Amino acid sequence: MDKRNYGIDLLRLLLMFMVCILHTLGQGGVLNNAIVGTTSYKIHWFTEIISYCAVDSFALISGYMISKNKLKYKKIINMWFQVFFYSFIISFIIKIININIPIGKNELISYMFPILNNIFWYMSAYFGLFIIIPILNPYLLKVKKDTAKKYFVSLFIIFSLLAYTKDPFKTTTGYSMIWLVILYCLGALANKIELFKQKKTSTLLIMYFISSITTWFIYMCFNNDKLISYISPLILLNGMILVIIFSRLKLNGKIISKLSPLALGIYLFQLNSIIWNIYLKDRFIFILNYNIFIEIALVFLFATLIFISGLVVEYIRIKLFELVKIEKLSDKIVECLSKIINKLSLLLN
C-alpha cells in the first residue's frame, strides 16, 4: 500500500482556498471593476496570479502521486454521484426554496447529466483522464529516469512553452481533457526524475515569486495576459513548485487527512450553475469601495466563507450518501458495467 503524504493532503486544501480566491476576484467582479492603474487593480491582479496555478497543481498531484495499486473504478462512479448532487440536487433544492430563481425545466434536465453537458469543465475533463489512466500508468511507472527527463522536457516545451501563444493542440488554454492528461504525465515524470531534488525549499519559494512577479509585470506594463493561462510555462512552473514543496513536508495528518477529501466538494459547490451565476456573479464589487488593506482582508474573508460553506455542504453530502448507501450502489454499477464490457469485448474475437 502506498504511504499517504499528508503534505499533499494539506496542499489540496490550500489549492482549493486559492480557487476560492480566484472566484472571489474573478466571478465576484473585483478584477473587472477595479480601475486600471490603481493600487487596487495592481494588488488584486497579483493575488490572482499567485493563485492561478491551483488548477494545474490539482492535476499535477494526480500524476505525482501515481500509484502501483490497481485503479478502483468505483471511485469514478462515486465521483459521478457527487457531481450529480452538486449539479442537479443542489439546483433542485435552491429552486424549491426560491421559486423565482430563473431556471427552466430544460436546464434542470441538463443538470441531470453533468458530465455529458460539461456543467463542470474540470470534472468532464477528469472523467476522460480517468478512463485512460490505466493505459498511461504501466509506462509511466516503468520508464527509466533518463528517458523520463527527455519526455518531461519535450512535453513542457511542446505543450506549454510553444503552445501558450497559439494553442495549436486545442487545449483551449487548459480548459480541456488533453491538458489534464499532459499535467498528469508531467506530474508522474517529475516524481520519477525527482525534479528540483537538489534545490532548497527556500530557493523554490523564490522561484515561485519571481515567476509570479514576472507574469504580473508583463501584464501590468504591456497589458499582455498570455502568461495568465493554465498552459503558461510560468503558471505551470508555479504549480509544479507547490507540489514539490508540499510533498517534502512531514506532518501528522489526522485532521488534514479527514478534511482533504472534502476539497473537491468545495469546488463543485461554488461552481453549481445557480450559485455561480446568481449568488457569486459580481457580488464582491463593493470591496473596491474601501482602502486597499481592507480590500485585501475582505477578499480573503469572502474566500474563507466560500471555502467553509463548501466544506460544510460537502460534509452533509457525505453523510447523506452514507445514509442512502451510495457506496453499495456504486459497487453494483461497477459490477454490471464490467459484465457488459466483458461481453462486448468478446465480440472483438
Which residues does each predicted region cover?
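Aromatic-anchored segments of alpha-helical transmembrane domains
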Residues: 17-24, 86-93, 109, 153-167, ...
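Interfacial loop-to-helix transition and helix-capping segments at the boundaries
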Residues: 42-55, 110-125, 164-183, 216-240, ...
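Loop-centered beta-sheet repeat module
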Residues: 147-194
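Alpha-helical transmembrane segments of multi-pass integral membrane proteins
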Residues: 96, 220-325, 342-345
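Solvent-exposed interhelical
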Residues: 131-157, 189-207
